Amino acid sequence: MNEQQRLASQQANSSTKKEEKDYSKYFESVYQPPSLKDAKKRGKEEVKIERDFGLPEEFRNFGTGRKFYIRTYGCQMNEHDTEVMAGIFTALGYEPTFSTEDADVVLLNTCAIRENAENKVFGELGHLKSLKRRNPDFLIGVCGCMSQEESVVNKIMQKNQHVDMVFGTHNIHRLPYILKDAMFSKETVVEVWSKEGDVIENLPKVRRGDIKAWVNIMYGCDKFCTYCIVPYTRGKERSRRPEDIIQEIRHLAANGYKEITLLGQNVNAYGKDFEDIEYGLGDLMDELRKVDIARIRFTTSHPRDFDDHLIEVLGKGGNLVEHIHLPVQSGSTDMLKIMARKYSREHYLELVRKIKEAIPDAVLTTDIIVGFPNETDEQFEETMSLYREVGFDTAFTFIYSPREGTPAAKMKDNVPMEVKKERLQRLNTLVNTLAIEKNSRYKGQIVEVLVDGESKNNPEVLAGYTRTNKLVNFVASKSLIGQLVKVKITEAKTWSLNGELVEEPIEVK
């Protein structure tokens, strides 16, 4: 997005403003909420790659003596965005804190995927109001996907006037300017771009750990499933250039990271927006096989774009793991059509067959929605039968939650809640049954585990994950944290495995 487009999406009097790329010129408060109607549009505007991000001199030591706190809701993409915002705060001179009471600035990085996530955010805003009363200089910000919704921004402006700033998913690189504006404004500063921005490289990051890292390979989604708000909140599909991704991953490998997760709302669409080269996710994964790093995985996949070349590359193994998260949402072709998933039950099963043929040890997990409008008992049974036929290791299961602004929200929600809950319970029983059955096959096997750290339930126990994303708990020295070890599985549980260390750190080959 260029500056002209940014102003047009935010200010009613945009035609009177200077159409310059120098964002620092604009500090005036903006009070117009975003537009989901505008966010749906997919124009031909060129998305630029900006590689010269830098902090203007005026912001040096801007945050010295101040502390920040970011609370993150939702997906890995939000976690990655938080790492970027933490990097910007640190570059400004702020120090991190793990307490809202100790912070000078609190950001809530929000998720819009379900109503429950939004309720949590508004509940937290209520708690923060007392801190604002005690300290008028205390800054509260709301960012992330919720900020891209008109109804949310309007609710904040009307009922949560103690919030100082609201910004969205497309302009987190403008955080220094938004902070400065919020400090001196007497009203809520709203800077939400309805349309996506450029791809900004070289943004600072404070990564959550030094063992595993998330790397964005693309942004946005053009699939417009009828239930999903993401294409509106994250914008159109924009791919990072492969050389930028490979350089970032090589840098992480050189700094000792063992595992990389490639991120995108739909990673299988990677490269489809390139006009100068034919290059997709399979090509990228083939190049990343040559990088000296132990494991590479990706999320989230869309069955519609999962092509044969990618399957062929994944079958080569090496540092490409055998775990694939492949959301199906429903086992009924009729339901999939209403959801606008653009594939059938048969297409999905054929894709699974190809994956298992190329990767015999592949572990598949999925997402499933129950109680979508018009879902019949027979259609739900199709979902149950597909789950058994594929033999998923586990699934994230949800009761349908209408999201304002999506086509499905206009459909009659005609499945009674008691029916939705009963279906979810039945599905979860099946998920749990297959999960313990799948995990039991690991008993007696020796598996490779990347040690994450101490178990959340017992600090005397170490916890880590296999290549197939199985949680393994075992007793060993804490010096092994961050290392790849061999563990013999002694006990299988529904959601985890217990084992014994049989071999200390192994070399990455």
Curated annotation (Swiss-Prot):
Catalytic activity, reaction form: N(6)-dimethylallyladenosine(37) in tRNA + (sulfur carrier)-SH + AH2 + 2 S-adenosyl-L-methionine = 2-methylsulfanyl-N(6)-dimethylallyladenosine(37) in tRNA + (sulfur carrier)-H + 5'-deoxyadenosine + L-methionine + A + S-adenosyl-L-homocysteine + 2 H(+)
Binding, [4Fe-4S] cluster 2: C221, C225, C228
GO biological process, one term: tRNA methylthiolation
Residue ranges occupied by any Radical SAM core domain in the UniProt entry: 207-437
Cofactor note: Binds 2 [4Fe-4S] clusters. One cluster is coordinated with 3 cysteines and an exchangeable S-adenosyl-L-methionine.
Signal peptide interval: none
Subunit (UniProt): Monomer.
Protein's UniProt name: tRNA-2-methylthio-N(6)-dimethylallyladenosine synthase
Organism: Bacillus cereus (strain ATCC 14579 / DSM 31 / CCUG 7414 / JCM 2152 / NBRC 15305 / NCIMB 9373 / NCTC 2599 / NRRL B-3711)
Gene name per UniProt: miaB
